[in-house]
From Swiss-Prot:
The keyword Cell membrane applies. It is a multi-pass membrane protein. GO terms for molecular function: P-type potassium transmembrane transporter activity; potassium ion binding. The system is composed of three essential subunits: KdpA, KdpB and KdpC. Belongs to the KdpA family. It is found in: Cell inner membrane. The gene is kdpA. This is Potassium-transporting ATPase potassium-binding subunit. One of its GO terms (cellular component) is plasma membrane. The chain crosses the membrane at residues 5-25, 64-84, 136-156, 179-199, 254-274, 285-305, 330-350, 357-376, 421-441, 486-506, 529-549.
Length: 567
């Protein structure tokens, strides 16, 4: 590790800290329905969309109606995206002549982008046409991100309201998020990326002749606009197979910094939105502090492991850290930082190959996802994920002091705890069961490139990434097979919707409750004691569930590497 590396990490953290409050202030006004500087521009369009859809901003929904609207909208998006893939060969804006996508891969991709996972069992430049990238994948990047933020806002309303029957309107929340938050920021980011050299064109691929006289096809396309939303919306799916390691997606250190900041920006701002909506900004800062502590710990371990490198390479007299699978324009520090950011959020974009990280370096992204990506998390998804842990933490605190658990004046009772635990436990259910089957199924084992514990880690990482709606991968697993396409697709759907429904149920239950005034015995939830308790619950409840699997995978691999054994 170097001083320069830590300075870059601290600069990133400082920028996120500076952006959290102003972004939170703006987003709070958007979802409150207050006037914003963009209201004269998007206001008429917003009202027109409501008239077309037959809804009104004054019409609110019970949590069940909110959930039904959300599920129907996502089902429609899934079917449209699947159809676009199957009909690709007959559709325009296909200069490379791409054919129809295989049915199993089309199912996997549709599930991937609808759930904000963006797991890719294909190379974008060799499989998807310009039309599919724009009208299919990029559109889902917007609406899946807006869906996640809408759920977070609905859950916050559950804590903020008292004796209410509704938690907002899904159509209104999603429309406002898209028009006032995602779209304006993405327009600005797209222009910045084009200025930095990222392509944005509908022209055909370019054929070039190299210095050796060989022919090479250079893939182009509407890249900048997709990169903007894939990072801001924590989608992560790359236009190119190499994702953010490709120079056309992430050309230099400036674009890399912007992309890292945009991955965390909205997720961090939601903590401030929470504080404003419940009337106590200290509550939001306490949540952000717990996220920040876990994040810094993850960055420190990952950076240390990658900077220390491989002892087997050190024995050869080479001591430069682990640069395998990393871009020289980013180096070890920014590669490790990006890896932790992209897995702390449910982004999944990569600027280095996680499969080439050391055993401990690769374990940190894995743990981030297994914790439910509650360290800032995806736009909306991470925040409603950490609120599930907050419900459990408050319940534990209540048990310790012998009082009925309360949070923000709302009594946390059996229903809320059961729903929170259901949301928390559905992730290991999807991650571990599919992994267990895959490592004993011959057709699934055949896709594993490496033996021993690293091969197991590749499979575990795949299903962990799917259920956590992350989308990053250990590249040694060949996932484009019927087994992996279907089971990973199912895992993505489970990880998304089996968390959403309990979260909305908690929102509806809390919104209907009366607010209880704080008393001398009320456990304070805006101080360092609560931050420590929340971190402890996340690590114990979320982390220990996966310890046996981690012991079989990266931990054994690390111990074997120390003793000179590789896989």
């Amino acid at each position: 590790m170097t001083l320069n590396g830590w300075i870059q990490i601290l600069v990133f953290c400082g920028i996120i800290g500076l952006l959290t409050k102003p972004l939170g202030f703006y987003m709070h006004r958007v979802f409150n329905g207050d006037r914003t500087p963009l209201s004269p521009i998007f206001g008429p369009l917003e009202r027109g969309l409501y008239r077309i859809c037959g809804t009104s901003e004054r019409e609110e929904q019970h949590w069940t109606a909110y959930a039904v609207a959300l599920l129907l909208f996502n089902l429609a998006g899934f079917l449209v995206l699947y159809a676009l893939q199957r009909l690709q060969g007959s559709l325009p804006y296909n200069p490379a002549g791409m054919g129809a996508v295989d049915p199993a891969l089309a199912f996997n991709t549709a599930a991937s982008f609808v759930t904000n996972t963006n797991w890719q069992n294909y190379g974008g430049e060799s499989t998807m046409s310009y039309l599919l990238q724009m009208a299919g994948l990029t559109v889902q990047n917007f609406v899946s991100a807006a869906t996640g933020i809408a759920i977070a806002i609905a859950l916050i309303r559950g804590f903020a309201r008292a004796s209410g029957k509704s938690i907002g309107n899904f159509w209104v929340d999603m429309t406002r998020c898209t028009l006032y938050v995602l779209l304006p920021l993405c327009i600005v980011l797209t222009l910045v990326y084009v200025w930095l050299g990222i392509p944005q064109t509908l022209g055909p691929y370019v054929d070039a002749t190299t210095l050796e006289g060989a022919k090479q096809t250079i893939a182009l396309g509407p890249v900048a606009s997709q990169v903007a939303i894939k990072m801001l919306g924590t989608n992560g799916g790359g236009f190119f197979n190499a994702n953010a390691a490709h120079p056309f997606e992430n050309p230099d250190a400036i674009s890399n910094l912007i992309q890292m900041v945009t991955i965390f920006a909205l997720g961090a701002a939601l903590t401030n939105v929470f504080g404003r909506m419940v009337g106590n900004q200290r509550q939001g800062w306490a949540i952000l502090a717990s996220m920040g502590a876990l994040f810094i710990a993850g960055v420190a371990v990952c950076y240390w492991a990658e900077a220390a490198g491989n002892p087997l390479v050190h024995a050869l007299g080479l001591d430069g850290g682990n640069m395998e699978g990393k871009e020289t324009r980013f180096g070890i520090a920014l590669s490790a930082l990006f890896a932790v950011i992209t897995t702390a959020a449910s982004c999944g974009a990569v600027n280095a190959m996680h499969d080439s990280f050391t055993a401990l370096g690769g374990m940190i992204p894995l743990i981030n996802m297994q914790l439910g990506e509650v360290i800032v998390g995806g736009v909306g998804a991470g925040f409603y994920g950490i609120l599930m842990f907050i419900v459990v933490a408050v319940f534990v605190a209540g048990l310790m002091v012998g009082r009925t658990p309360e949070y923000l004046g709302k009594k946390i009772e059996a229903k809320e705890v059961k729903m929170a635990m259901l949301a928390i436990l559905c992730l290991p259910l999807a991650m571990l069961i599919f992994t267990a089957i895959a490592v004993v199924l011959p057709s699934a084992v055949a896709s594993i490139a490496n033996g021993g514990p690293h091969g197991f880690s590749e499979v575990l990482y795949a299903y962990t990434s799917a259920a956590a709606n992350n989308g990053s991968a250990f590249g040694g697993l060949s996932g484009n097979t019927p087994w992996y396409n279907i089971t990973i697709g199912i895992g993505m759907l489970m990880g998304r919707f089996l968390v959403i429904i309990p979260a909305l149920a908690i929102a509806g239950s809390l919104a209907a409750k009366k607010t209880v005034p704080a008393s001398a015995g009320t456990f304070p939830t805006d101080g360092p004691l609560f931050v420590g308790l929340l971190i402890g619950v996340i690590v114990i409840v979320g982390g220990l569930t996966f310890f046996p699997a981690l012991a079989v995978g990266p931990i054994i691999e690390h111990l074997a590497m120390i003793h000179g054994q590789t896989f």
